[in-house]
Amino acid sequence: MRLLGIETSCDETAAAVIEYNNESSSRILSNIVWSQIDHHAPYGGVVPEIAARAHVEILDHLILQALTEANTKLKDIDGIAATSGPGLIGGLLVGVMSAKALSLATGKPFIAVNHLEGHALTAVLTHNVKFPYLLLLVSGGHTQTILVHGVGNYQRLGTTIDDALGEAFDKTAKLLGLPYPGGPALEKAALLGDKNRIPLPRPLKGEKRLDFSFSGLKTAVRQAATAIAPLTENDVADIAASFQAAVTDTVRDRVHLALQHFTHQYPLSHDQEKHSPALVVAGGVAANQALRSTLQELAHQHGFEFIAPPLSLCTDNAAMIAFAGAQKLAQGETSSLDIAPRSRWPLDEKAIPLIGMGRRGTKA
């Protein structure tokens, strides 16, 4: 079957068509992404109203382009999947209403997809990874370790108690005067810097809880930058390198605990005669090469296979939404046209909050 996917949760407008036969033989027929970076760069961050208006202006064109590249007519589509949360509500409304309109016009089912579930299942699309696996989701709005037991079955182990990792990258880059988007700019600057020059904290390192924290690290960077201002290019590079080293050390420590938790919960998954368990990284920050290298080394130390989707599927895209929607549709799951988009929508929505586990993230 063929699914049309629509993604409008933040500052990328995207449409895609996939062909789904089963989990191990699905193909991306088209995957169109239009970035709004130029719209938001003058403001140093995403402006929600500008983002929503940009989605309105371009989405219809992208849907047509996705269908054309997939050599597929709308009447041949078996279902229409759209990101329905979490995210910026204005953008979500654009995508959801467009998907509902197409569903009404064609009589094809509408499938509301959790944006986080799209990221969580991308590795199944790209690498045919087997359930269960451990997911590290790192983006501008989320930093979570999640046990993926199966489609629709997720167990959050840890989350950020303050800022998401992508947000920390962007705000640190802005503090250093680096261009928007800040994450890639900071990573590039760090290549030229001395990571040992600026002593920075590793928040929560050594603690048994599985949560993350990055606000204190941001504050330490601000204090260091203020102490040596005005900043030279070398200063900026050294601070960027020191920040990135602190981040990778912190993430390594947190994921180390999550891998131990996984091994305790699934001891038989280490039976090498079957297959190695997998550590999957997803989300926009997963494009950071220093983070990838650190996680790959850590995974191998624990006997895990390390899986990172292609860079084009780490950032927001509609192929992952179409694939998640296809898996739901294959299980007979569709959504009512009365469903409303949600700015907050945790993957483990039915889980009982645990004391000391922190809040559920800025968008979850």
Swiss-Prot record:
Molecular function GO labels: iron ion binding; N(6)-L-threonylcarbamoyladenine synthase activity
Co-factor binding details: Binds 1 Fe(2+) ion per subunit.
Binding site for Fe cation: 115, 119, 316
Name of the coding gene: tsaD
Reactions this protein catalyses: L-threonylcarbamoyladenylate + adenosine(37) in tRNA = N(6)-L-threonylcarbamoyladenosine(37) in tRNA + AMP + H(+)
Keyword Iron: yes
Cofactor(s) required, per the database record: Fe(2+)
Gene Ontology terms: biological process: tRNA threonylcarbamoyladenosine modification
Broad EC category: transferase
Name listed for the protein in its UniProt record: tRNA N6-adenosine threonylcarbamoyltransferase
Compartments, as annotated in UniProt: Cytoplasm
GO cellular component, as recorded: cytoplasm
Family the entry assigns: Belongs to the KAE1 / TsaD family.
Claim: tRNA processing is one of the keywords in the record: yes
Organism: Bartonella tribocorum (strain CIP 105476 / IBS 506)
InterPro entries per UniProt: ATPase_NBD (IPR043129), Gcp-like_dom (IPR000905), KAE1/TsaD (IPR017861), TsaD (IPR022450)
HAMAP family membership: TsaD (MF_01445)
Top-level lineage group: Bacteria
PANTHER family reported in the protein's UniProt record: TRNA N6-ADENOSINE THREONYLCARBAMOYLTRANSFERASE, TRNA N6-ADENOSINE THREONYLCARBAMOYLTRANSFERASE, MITOCHONDRIAL
Function in brief: Required for the formation of a threonylcarbamoyl group on adenosine at position 37 (t(6)A37) in tRNAs that read codons beginning with adenine. Is involved in the transfer of the threonylcarbamoyl moiety of threonylcarbamoyl-AMP (TC-AMP) to the N6 group of A37, together with TsaE and TsaB. TsaD likely plays a direct catalytic role in this reaction.
Keywords from the UniProt entry: Acyltransferase, Cytoplasm, Iron, Metal-binding, Transferase, tRNA processing
EC number(s) from the headed UniProt entry: 2.3.1.234
Binding residue positions for substrate: 137-141, 170, 183, 288
Principal place of residence: cytoplasm
